[in-house]
């Protein structure tokens, strides 16, 4: 290998995407090393086992590829910069997205700094399904080639500088191709299922987990007409548009259409429900977003036409965006949208390019 080979540290999660990313970078002539991050300390045996198994898988892959694996503990950073904010949002009756925060504070901040400063890396790499393109001297974030797996929604907080220091090898591939490469190489992660659940906390029973940190406060479930029809176990367990877990059946009029959460009255600890997933109370004509992050880091002024996603895997919604001030925008959808949820992120696109996004501060309800 030449003296000039650039050094890349791959965030090895013990999953198939980061495993194949490491191999692809080797094929491209980079000097590759891996880094396994431990970001969660609190816990019961179950989570410890998951983390231990993931580390063992990451180590097995690195051994197979002949690369060094470093480990680092970012549990304090995760607790301070991700988890405490996550709890505060739930406490305020909003529904945060911890994966977005984790990418912002851990993977593309703590990891990026550690790789550059402690390990002498030129770049970091992750197994995210996104692409980068350098245009006019700035790195842009593009959707992953596999539209079914595209993860740009979770990376909208990244700046062009962070993207310039990051490589996303699987972003150019479809997921089945990634699995096929792993199988052909005989990697232990080839058939490992994709992780779901909260970022580094893994797949645990969410209600039970949240209950450890936030005391649940039961309260009334009320219909949009003001009838009390049940009791909820805590507003934090419910999100707009939710149907499951309400514990209420049909109505006295006999209609069997399912109930959906349409609003939360945090002040009075009341959950408001209506029947039908397209109930007018569930629809929004737009939203106000704050805590904005634009990938090019240029302040947004005036108005623009683009598309928006108000949750992961949603079909793009055509919209008009208008700057209200330095850190707030108003977004008006071309057509009403269901279940726009405060606390979640609104992420904007111009074709393949992810422009950035912000946190949904409030939804603009359909006038009824």
UniProtKB/Swiss-Prot annotation:
A Pfam family reported for this protein in Swiss-Prot or TrEMBL: tRNA_Me_trans_M
GO biological process, alphabetically ordered: tRNA wobble position uridine thiolation
Catalytic activity: S-sulfanyl-L-cysteinyl-[protein] + uridine(34) in tRNA + AH2 + ATP = 2-thiouridine(34) in tRNA + L-cysteinyl-[protein] + A + AMP + diphosphate + H(+)
InterPro entries given in the database record: MnmA-like, MnmA-like_C, MnmA-like_central, MnmA-like_central_sf, Rossmann-like_a/b/a_fold
Compartments (UniProt record): Cytoplasm
Interaction with target base in tRNA: annotated segments: 97-99
GO molecular function: ATP binding; tRNA binding; tRNA-uridine 2-sulfurtransferase activity
Enzyme Commission no: 2.8.1.13
Disulphide-bonded residues: 102-199
Role: Catalyzes the 2-thiolation of uridine at the wobble position (U34) of tRNA(Lys), tRNA(Glu) and tRNA(Gln), leading to the formation of s(2)U34, the first step of tRNA-mnm(5)s(2)U34 synthesis. Sulfur is provided by IscS, via a sulfur-relay system. Binds ATP and its substrate tRNAs.
Subunit architecture: Interacts with TusE.
Family, as annotated: Belongs to the MnmA/TRMU family.
Listed name of the protein: tRNA-specific 2-thiouridylase MnmA
Protein source organism: Escherichia coli (strain SMS-3-5 / SECEC)
Source taxonomy: Bacteria, Pseudomonadati, Pseudomonadota, Gammaproteobacteria, Enterobacterales
Underlying gene: mnmA
């Amino acid at each position: 290998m030449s003296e000039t080979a650039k050094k890349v540290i791959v965030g090895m999660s013990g999953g198939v995407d980061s495993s194949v990313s490491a191999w692809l970078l080797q094929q491209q002539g980079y000097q590759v090393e891996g880094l396994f991050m431990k970001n969660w300390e609190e816990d019961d045996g179950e989570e410890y086992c998951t983390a231990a198994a993931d580390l063992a898988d990451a180590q097995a892959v690195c051994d197979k590829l002949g690369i060094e694996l470093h480990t680092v503990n970012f549990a304090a950073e995760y607790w301070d910069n991700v988890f405490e904010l996550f709890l505060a949002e739930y406490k305020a009756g909003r529904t945060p997205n911890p994966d977005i925060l984790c990418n912002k504070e851990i993977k593309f901040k703590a990891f990026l700094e550690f790789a550059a400063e402690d390990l002498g890396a030129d770049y970091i790499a992750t197994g995210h399904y996104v692409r980068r393109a350098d245009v006019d001297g700035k790195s842009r974030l593009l959707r992953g080639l596999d539209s079914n797996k595209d993860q740009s929604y979770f990376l909208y907080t990244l700046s062009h500088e962070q993207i310039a220091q990051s490589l996303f090898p699987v972003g150019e591939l479809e997921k089945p191709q990634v699995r096929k490469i792993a199988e052909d190489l005989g990697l232990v992660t080839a058939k490992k299922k994709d992780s779901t659940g909260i970022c580094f906390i893994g797949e645990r029973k969410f209600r039970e987990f949240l209950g450890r940190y936030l005391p649940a406060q039961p309260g009334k479930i009320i219909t949009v007409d003001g009838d009390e029809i049940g009791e909820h176990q805590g507003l934090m367990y419910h999100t707009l548009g939710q149907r499951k877990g309400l514990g209420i059946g049909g109505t006295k009029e006999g209609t069997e259409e399912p109930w959906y959460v349409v609003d939360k009255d945090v002040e009075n600890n009341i959950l408001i429900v209506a029947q039908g997933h397209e109930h007018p109370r569930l629809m929004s004509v737009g939203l106000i977003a704050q805590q904005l992050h634009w990938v090019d880091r240029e302040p947004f002024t005036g108005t623009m036409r683009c598309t928006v996603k108000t949750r992961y895997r949603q079909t793009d919604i055509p919209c008009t965006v208008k700057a209200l001030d330095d850190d707030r925008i108003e977004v008006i959808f071309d057509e009403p949208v269901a279940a726009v949820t405060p606390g979640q992120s609104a992420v904007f696109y111009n074709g393949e390019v992810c422009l950035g996004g912000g946190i949904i501060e409030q939804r603009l309800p359909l006038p009824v």
